[in-house]
From Swiss-Prot:
It holds the Pfam family Asp-Al_Ex. The gene is ybjL. Gene3D superfamilies: Regulator of K+ conductance, C-terminal domain. This is Putative transport protein YbjL. GO terms for molecular function: monoatomic cation transmembrane transporter activity. The chain crosses the membrane at residues 8-28, 32-52, 66-86, 94-114, 158-178, 383-403, 406-426, 447-467, 475-495, 540-560. One of its GO terms (cellular component) is plasma membrane. PANTHER family: K(+)_H(+) ANTIPORTER SUBUNIT KHTT, TRANSPORT PROTEIN YBJL-RELATED.
Length: 561
């Protein structure tokens, strides 16, 4: 039996789509030196090559892909978006505005200088900024702009062409810039990180190992009684000295949970909870042959839970004010916008932050009720909320504003982004509403993006050869300028206007570019995860601004002449 592969793919859009995705994902795993191509560029390259052979898919698949992607971007940004917008994230908001605004203005200027159309200009902006939200926002606005079908087809083709030609330029140049810009500016990020660590009491070890606390029990003998000298537990300050916490006392056969006024007596059996190194710091009078192995005394259920910060008595407060250790709980991690933060007593908690806490199950539950709620460890997505807010986003996107003879619509991209932000925000405030496991959210977002990239590549592939020959050199120059000049402007603004700590500033700059690989370079240079504070501060707002930038550039382009 002979199978004509070309006819088979042309006759089955679904098969063609998944062939493009599979081949593109394989290509995306390749590395050029230390830089991995990535899934987006892999799928785009394969789809462009197949598009040259006149393969195509239904545009409905492309539209659904971008809708899923942009909605999930909003859901991820939602928990922290409003706290960054309205509170102490003013500096981060301003940095993101400077980064996105300067890139937008430079792209507009270069587009007019080289005589490009709107498609090439926006594609170059999206690729140079390695920002798919720009591409998605612009593509949706173009489709609803009312321009002639031939112009629309050309603009959409050039959109993906500009993105494909400048994406690697933007990615590689930013990674190189992240490595060498601190040196060119004579900035010692390691010293800056250590400086802010001393000021705030941060843990500067980016690779800090996390252990579960362990339970050990000891019998109080004459040496320990002499060591306590009649002081109560509060006066002894065992936790302050060692990091261990007395969880239980058995006295005369009765188990009890002690308070700070308890005084140790001869014959007491005490259960201490702490990390392994904390037990090693105990005074020798605890350990000298007096360890007790008793099921009832040691029978505590130590759990590790992820607590989502929600309640007003925790939001806006410093981490130290929670006094977790006073309640027998141990903090392992602080996570904001999926970025692990340094454990810093002076970190101000935002709504939606996640604290990974270990301790006795009862105590952890008490802490969770006080500051928020325990993240649901369910693998079931609230599909009803997902679909309802998706519908709301589409309806918002249908709104059109009319000014005299000029009209413009909000568009699906902005509508879905707003609806996603609201769903994410409500999820951070109501533990049983709108739950989407992070793995499921990542999968839907990535799948939507890959479908969108496959669609734009297949539709633009037939004209890539002519386009490359006509604008290839110009694209190289423009890509480098748009990728690096806004970073330099952002650095100057943050350093000399906002006067930010350099380690935080460089992290915030990478967050404003939404570039995780460059963030890793900055953390390695600083030998600290302190820059993650800055990255998390700008990342969520930058994703939103970049989507709006793609919409805005299409709206204002006709008025520039």
């Amino acid at each position: 039996m002979n199978i004509n592969v070309a006819d088979l793919l042309n006759g089955n859009y679904i098969l063609l789509l998944f062939v493009v995705l599979a081949l593109g994902l394989c290509l995306g795993k390749l590395r050029l030196g230390s830089v991995q191509l990535g899934n987006s560029i892999g799928v785009l390259v394969v789809s462009l090559l197949l598009g040259q052979q006149h393969f195509s898919i239904n545009t409905d698949a492309l539209n659904l892909g971008f809708m899923l992607f942009i909605f999930c971007v909003g859901v991820e940004a939602g928990p922290n978006f409003f706290s960054i917008f309205f509170r102490d994230g003013k500096n981060y908001l301003m940095l993101a505005l400077v980064m996105v605004g300067s890139a937008l203005l430079i792209a507009l200027g270069l587009g007019k200088l080289f005589g490009w159309d709107i498609g090439l200009t926006v594609g170059m902006l999206a690729g140079s900024m390695t920002s798919t939200p720009v591409l998605v926002g612009a593509g949706d606005t173009l489709r609803h702009s009312g321009i002639a079908s031939t112009q629309l087809s050309s603009a959409l083709d050039n959109l993906s062409l500009g993105y494909a030609l400048t994406y690697l330029i933007g990615l590689v140049s930013l990674i190189v810039g992240a490595r060498y810009l601190p040196k060119l500016q004579h900035q010692d990020l390691q010293t800056s990180a250590q400086q802010i660590a001393r000021e705030r009491g941060l843990d500067t070890d980016a690779n800090r190992k996390v252990y579960l606390p362990v339970i050990r029990a000891y019998r109080v003998g004459p040496e320990l009684v002499a060591w306590t000298d009649g002081k109560n537990l509060r006066e002894l300050g065992i936790y302050r000295q060692t990091g261990c916490y007395i969880e239980r006392i058995r006295r005369n056969g009765i188990l009890a949970n002690p308070d700070g006024d308890a005084v140790l007596q001869m014959g007491d059996e005490i259960a201490l909870v702490g990390y392994p190194d904390a037990h090693a710091r105990l005074d020798p009078s605890f350990r000298n042959g007096k360890e007790v192995f008793d099921r009832d005394l040691l029978d505590m259920r130590i759990v590790t839970e992820e607590i989502v910060v929600k309640n007003h008595n925790a939001v806006g407060r410093r981490l130290a004010q929670l006094k977790l250790t006073d309640h027998g709980c141990f903090l392992n991690r602080v996570i904001r916008s999926q970025i692990e933060m340094p454990i810093d007593d002076n970190v101000v908690l935002n709504k939606g932050d996640v604290l990974q806490v270990s301790g006795d199950a009862r105590r952890v539950k008490t802490i969770a009720d006080r500051i928020g709620f325990i993240s649901i460890h369910s693998q079931v997505t609230d599909l009803l909320a997902f679909c309802a807010f998706f519908i709301i986003g589409l309806m918002i996107g249908m709104i059109t504003f009319q000014f005299s003879n000029f009209s413009f619509g909000i568009g699906n991209a902005a509508g879905l982004l707003f609806a996603g932000i609201m769903l994410g925000f409500l999820r951070a405030n109501h533990p049983t509403f709108g739950y989407i496991p992070q793995g499921a959210l990542n999968m839907v977002k990535e799948f939507g993006l890959m479908v969108f990239m496959a669609g734009v590549g297949l539709s633009a592939g037939s004209g890539i050869s002519n386009g490359l020959g006509a604008v290839g050199g110009q694209m190289l120059i423009a890509g480098l300028v748009v990728s690096l000049v806004p970073v330099v402007i952002c650095f100057l603004f943050g350093a000399y206007v906002l006067r930010m700590n350099r380690a935080l500033l460089f992290g915030a700059m990478m967050g404003a570019r939404t570039c995780a690989p460059a963030m890793e370079i900055i953390s390695d240079t600083a030998r600290s995860n302190i820059p993650a504070l800055g990255y998390a501060g700008t990342y969520a707002i930058a994703n939103v601004l970049l989507t709006l930038a793609g919409t805005l550039i299409v709206i204002i382009w006709p008025g520039l002449g």
